[in-house]
């Protein structure tokens, strides 16, 4: 299995560095973006296996980024984990409506982060295998 690619998106460099410090030792390939527009460009350039997405960002917030990713056929099945300091129920509902697959509340618990990532990547890889098999059957 290839090294899974994780797109980490946060406008605060220290938050990005913290997530990288958790992920790189676990053998994940980390790609970073510091705003929503950059995140969408990175997702096109280097298709991720999962996106860790901050909610509160300038220019384009995480809800908009998530919705854009989920509306794009090339990224619609990429799991998106909203990473947020927001704890309101309405914010979580808005994230679900935008297509988020999971939520993590700041401050991030390292063990919880890694467990959720492993679970979502496993599902993503199963989906990719199923899609590949379907295409092969169609040929």
Please identify what each model-predicted range represents:
Residues 120, 125-139:
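Amphipathic alpha-helical coiled-coil "transmission" helices that mediate dimerization
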Residues 58, 106:
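A Lys-centered signature of the CheY-like receiver
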Residues 4, 13-37, 45:
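Two-component/phosphorelay signaling modules centered on CheY-like receiver
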Residues 46-55:
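Active-site beta3 strand of CheY-like receiver
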């Amino acid at each position: 299995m290839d090294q899974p690619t994780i797109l980490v998106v946060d406008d605060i460099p220290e938050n990005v560095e913290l997530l990288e410090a958790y992920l790189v030792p676990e053998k994940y390939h980390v790609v970073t973006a510091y705003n929503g527009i950059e995140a969408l460009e990175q997702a096109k350039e280097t298709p991720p296996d999962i996106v860790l997405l901050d909610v509160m960002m300038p220019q384009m917030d995480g809800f908009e980024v998530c919705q854009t990713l989920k509306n794009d056929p090339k990224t619609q099945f990429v799991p998106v984990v909203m990473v947020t300091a927001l704890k309101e129920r309405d914010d979580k509902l808005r994230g679900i409506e935008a297509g988020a697959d999971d939520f993590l509340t700041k401050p991030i618990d390292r063990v919880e982060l890694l467990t959720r990532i492993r679970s979502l990547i496993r599902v993503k890889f199963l989906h990719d295998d199923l899609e590949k098999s379907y295409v092969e059957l169609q040929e």
